[in-house]
Amino acid sequence: MVRSGKKAVVLATVAFCATSVVQKTCGFVPSPLRQRAAAAGAAASVATMFAPAAFADEIGDAAKTLGDASYAFAKEVDWNNGIFLQAPGKLQPLAALKAIDKMIVMGAAADPQLLKAAAEAHHKAITTVSGANGVTSRADWDNVNAALGRVISAVPEKMVMDVYNSVAKITDPKVPAYMNSLVNGADAEKAYAGFLAFKDVVKKNQVTSAAGPATVPSGDTIGVAAQKLSDASYPFLKQIDWLSDVYLKPLPGVSAQQSLKAIDRMIVMGAQADGNALKAAAEAHHKAIGSIDAKGVTSAADYAEVNAAIGRVVASVPKSTVMDVYKAMASVTDTGIPLNMFSKVNPLDANAAAKAFYTFKDVVLAAQR
C-alpha cells in the first residue's frame, strides 16, 4: 500500500497542479496532496465544445468511472486539514521551486481553452462543497476530473512525467503511508485502481508535441511601465527572504472555507484572463526561475518581464473581477501581516516600491478591458 499510495499521491498532485499557479488552499480539489492553488477552467460540458466529440466523451466517461471508484475515498479525506499547507517532507525551497517550474512549463504548454474549462469546473465545484470534510458533490467531482484529464491530454507525456518525477523528489517516503492512515485503506486502493484506468484513457488521447510559445507585445505602455516599476522596486525585492517558511504559514484566524472563498475569486479571475497573456506570464516565470541566485532572487531583466506579463494578464480581466480578488484577500489578511513583512526589509526601499507599484497599477487600469 505504501508503494501504490505514493504513486497515488504524486500522480494526483500532477493532475491538480496542471491548473494551479502556486496558491495555498485548504478546500476541495481532487488530490490528497495539495500545496497551492490557482488555476484556469470550465465545466466539462463547456470543455467538450473545444474538443472532438469522441475525445470528450471518452475522457468524460472515464472520469465518471473514476468517480465510481474514488468518490468514497474523496469523502473520507479531510480537505480542511491544515496539513495540506505543509511541505511534503523537509522544507526545501529551491528544490520545491524546481518542481513548481515543471508545473509552470506544463501549464504553459496546455490548451488555453481546456485550462479555462478546468478553472470553471473548479469554481463550480467550490459552490457545492459541504460537510465536515469540505468535499464537493459527486457530479462536480466527476466534472473536475474530466476537465483535468483533458488538460493533461493536451500536453506531451514527457512534460507530465517531469512534474511527476520532480514532485516525487521532494516528497518524503513516509508521507503516503501517513495519508493512507487517515482514510479507509480499501477505499484508497479502489480509488488508485480507478485512477490508473483513467490515466490510461488520458494517455491514449495525449498529444505528442507542445504548442508554440506565446506572442509577447513589444513597446506597449504596460511593458514600459513595468520596467519603471522594476527599476524602483528591485532593491526591495533583493531584501526579501524568498527561502523563508513564512509563506507556508496559515493565515491567522482564517478557516479553510474562508480561504477557499478567497481562492475561488482568483480562480474566476484566471478563467476570465486572456489565454495568450496567461501563457506568456507562465513562460516569463519559467525564464525568471532559470536566473535565480542562491537566495532565490531572479535577475533584474527577468523581474521586469514577469511584472510586464502579470500586468498584461490583469489588464485582460474586467476591473470588477480584479477587485473581487483584492477584497477577498483583504478579508482574510490580518493587519499584522503587512506590518510583519514590512519589518523585515528597509522601509525606504519598501515605500519606493509601493509608490512605483501604484503608478504601474494606473497604467494597467488604463489598458484594462
From Swiss-Prot:
Compartments where found: Plastid, Chloroplast
Annotated Sequence repeat ranges: 57-219, 220-369
Residue range of the transit peptide in the UniProt record, numbered on this chain: 1-56
Gene3D superfamilies, sorted: Peridinin-chlorophyll A binding
GO MF term list: chlorophyll binding
Keywords for this protein: Chlorophyll, Chloroplast, Chromophore, Light-harvesting polypeptide, Plastid, Repeat, Transit peptide
Domain of life: Eukaryota
InterPro entries per UniProt: Peridinin-chlorophyll-bd_prot, Peridinin-chlorophyll-bd_sf
Record remark: domains: The mature protein is composed of 2 almost identical repeat units.
Protein name stated in the entry: Peridinin-chlorophyll a-binding protein 2, chloroplastic
Organism field: Amphidinium carterae (Dinoflagellate)
